Amino acid sequence: MKTLSPTGYGLLLVLPLLLAVLQSTTAHKNDINIYSLTVDSKVSSRFAHTVVTSRVVNKGSAVQEATFQMELPKKAFITNFSMIIDGVTYPGNIKEKAAAQEQYSAVARGESAGLVRATGRKTEQFQVAVSVAPAAKVTFELVYEELLARHLGVYELLLKIQPQQLVKHLQMDIHIFEPQGISFLETESTFMTNELAEALTISQNKTKAHIRFKPTLSQQQKSPEQQETVLDGNFIVRYDVNRTVTGGSIQIENGYFVHYFAPEVWSAIPKNVIFVIDTSGSMRGRKIQQTREALIKILGDLGSRDQFNLVSFSGEAPRRRAVAASAENVEEAKSYAAEIHAQGGTNINDAMLMAVQLLERANREELLPARSVTFIILLTDGDPTVGETNPSKIQKNVREAIDGQHSLFCLGFGFDVPYAFLEKMALENGGLARRIYEDSDSALQLEDFYQEVANPLLRLVAFEYPSNAVEEVTQDNFRLFFKGSELVVAGKLRDQSPDVLSAKVRGQLHMENVTFVMESRVAEQEAEFLSPKYIFHSFMERLWAYLTIQQLLAQTVSASDAEKKALEARALSLSLNYSFVTPLTSMVITKPEGQEQSQVAEKPVENGNRQGNTHSGHSSFQFHSVGDRTSRLTGGSSVDPVFSHRRGWKGQAQGFEKMSYLPPRLGPPGPLQPTRFSHPFSRITLDRVLPEVLSVPDETSHDMDSRIIGATIPPPPARIQAPSVILPLPGQSVDQLCVDLKHSQGPVKLLSDPGQGVEVTGHYEREKARFSWIEVTFKHPPLQVRASLEHIVVIRNRQSSAYKWKETLYSVMPGLKITMDKAGLLLLSSPNRVTIGLLSWDGPGKGLRLLLRDTDHFSSQISGTFGQFYQDVVWGPPAAADDSKRTVTVQGHDHSATRELKLDYQEGSPGKEISCWTVVL
């Protein structure tokens, strides 16, 4: 984490989506001490009001600078910030941006304050510094608000905690109040230990939930001997609400209403989707590889009633015909996607026009399903370089070609992409833009975006209210409604409005129109929000203002100059009236006399190729290459040189540019000398540390070490390997069994137990003797965990969350707990269930390993390659004098079992040697 100043303090708190960060900036943690830090977040009907309060004291003997640094979600609006120093409050004042800059420039001589900047995928960073006298105390308080959006069926609050020091009073409280009722609630943490879990309490009833985290000093410590904190990571709350057949809920508070609408009772409308893929040279390498992976997965998720096209462009856009998503066509398209290569220029204009032409031609020829929806998904990573390159002209061409008939979604890959250009083009055509961050999970980001739009349930959705009942209503017409999302409309009740607010929502299903009728009694709804414990005053009015401002700002992107001026004027007025820091306003922060008198906090706007100090949300690292051509080899390393049998080898193997390793010299100890050899070695294993650097012999070196010529090199002893799996067998004469897969290749069903509601499959690579991936699927809760050598992906409600191996994880949901420790052991457990473990094994036979615990919970329905050993297993008598061989009968089939030395991987690398009965399958 970045250090901002010689002294300071900190805590990173993220709540998306709620998010806040107070980060340590001190090299001397005892000087600036955080003695109290509290987070209070009240979520009332999806609208989150978060207050972060930090109290610090300067324990040093000199003046110290304390830097208050926080991260908050990009869609959140700061509403207040203040500092209390020696009993005097220094508030932040929100003003029009131009006026705030003028005030600041008068003090700072025109220098930019830079108090808020974009930092991550979903976050912005706020920071302010103040000098603190010895023994003086400072209280910082930041308030921000956000409407939580429903994403793939869940609302999410995320807290990222990194105090970097022990805090005497650390407390986080999250109150959730949902009048519709909370259907499920789950928590996840990347720092939680069993001891810390005792500081977490969750209470919940039908409509309310309270989550409190209040660790003691001892619970925060890494160990009793260390004064360092273990708090370093994420804490996440996910939930959803109950829904009626109508899918809607009208809620009223203090003269304002909000209407939530999310029906999920029909099958999806057939869709016709054109994927326009940038295959220009700038996409080569990791980008095009991840694009191929995502496309193959997305194609497999197409519905049988869907139609699709693939359009790639690389200087010229090749034409491809529209096809139905039949199994044959999907497999053909997957093969095509797997062969996509990056080369040439970026021809956005022609590729986009061709995509529209394909849809129009299919429509004219009546090839598209009746009343289906059509949209185009564009993925690109750079500016147009071939054909039409003027962004405004491309936008005009695309807008005229689409003519309101299709929806356009633009995905910008990386930070070199012209995001403002893509955003305007998408919004002008009924879609949206999304940035895809260059990272190990880029393919997952693409897949997740597709899942958001994969299931359109309604089209042309319109909300209607009596004109004598409401006014100043937010957007009430929507082109599409997708499964897992939510449409939100808010407004103001008229002074003489009826006692009952009625509403109609009209939309189109696949083959019919539908109208939803809802009513809400004003007095009853007002009574729902009387409890001050769970709501803050006039929250629904602020929700209405927040939503109105967000929509006005979105409209300015594609508006004409005259329209833009009017939209911005209204958004500015609301921002000032409700004290929101938006792209049109700034917060002027005053300081004590003698310090820099004021600073300005502004809302960053994502409208350029690169946003100043924007990063992907991960730390930056510097990589240094070694300049010399030698390598130091250490004990236990192994190298696999392959040398040509051809004559005339001149200091290097055929097909290799250079060689930087040689075998250890045979014979008595002595100084290491460069050696040459005249015959190939297929493998050389170095089992000791070589004290000198070995270099490649030059071309003129023809002397052979006499001790190597004619010497017999004994083969290295075979390493003890970890088996494919170790199966605990409770209640049998053999307490555990090692199973090696020697004859399997490709997907293997390892376990299937309908009684437990679990299935485990894996992909076995016979040549490498390892699993390349293992997938665990649970029926209740519906969840899938897919582990590869690189990372773990948890999929729930079509939403993917990726985790790196050896990251601490602690997730509790109804019916399942997921944990992972620093050793990389992932455990999936639940009462009265078999515990399934996954491990990325770094020892000999590197690869994924499966662990099983509590196997007595398997039902009589268990089956599979490994599961069969929990059904009707009979061990025969010893078949050898030394009791090293036995026969084991499994479901009537005999298998030979041999007692062998194996590495037990169950506690991680390096493993320990065990004697284990081994069966080869």
UniProtKB/Swiss-Prot annotation:
Disulfide bonds: 738-916
Keyword Ribonucleoprotein in record: no
Keywords, sorted A to Z: Acute phase, Disulfide bond, Glycoprotein, Protease inhibitor, Secreted, Serine protease inhibitor, Signal
Inducing or repressing factors: Levels increase significantly after cardiogenic shock. Specifically induced by the cytokine IL6 in hepatocytes.
Record's GO cellular component terms: extracellular region
Subcellular localization: Secreted
InterPro entries, sorted: ITI_HC_C (IPR010600), ITIH (IPR050934), VIT (IPR013694), VWF_A (IPR002035), vWFA_dom_sf (IPR036465)
CDD domains reported in the protein's UniProt record: vWA_interalpha_trypsin_inhibitor
GO biological process: acute-phase response; hyaluronan metabolic process; response to cytokine
KW NADP (keyword) present: no
UniProt feature, compositional bias: Polar residues: 608-623
Molecular function terms from GO: serine-type endopeptidase inhibitor activity
Positions of the VIT domain: 28-146
Processing after translation: Appears to be both N- and O-glycosylated.
Tissue specificity remark: Liver specific.
Residue ranges that the Swiss-Prot or TrEMBL entry lists as coiled coil: none
Signal peptide: 1-27
VWFA domain sequence ranges: 270-428
Domain of life: Eukaryota
Location of the region described as Disordered in the Swiss-Prot/TrEMBL record: 591-646
Pfam families, per the entry: ITI_HC_C, VIT, VWA
Similarity comment: Belongs to the ITIH family.
Function: Type II acute-phase protein (APP) involved in inflammatory responses to trauma. May also play a role in liver development or regeneration.
Subunit structure: Interacts (via C-terminus) with DNAJC1 (via SANT 2 domain).
Protein name: Inter-alpha-trypsin inhibitor heavy chain H4
Biological source species: Sus scrofa (Pig)
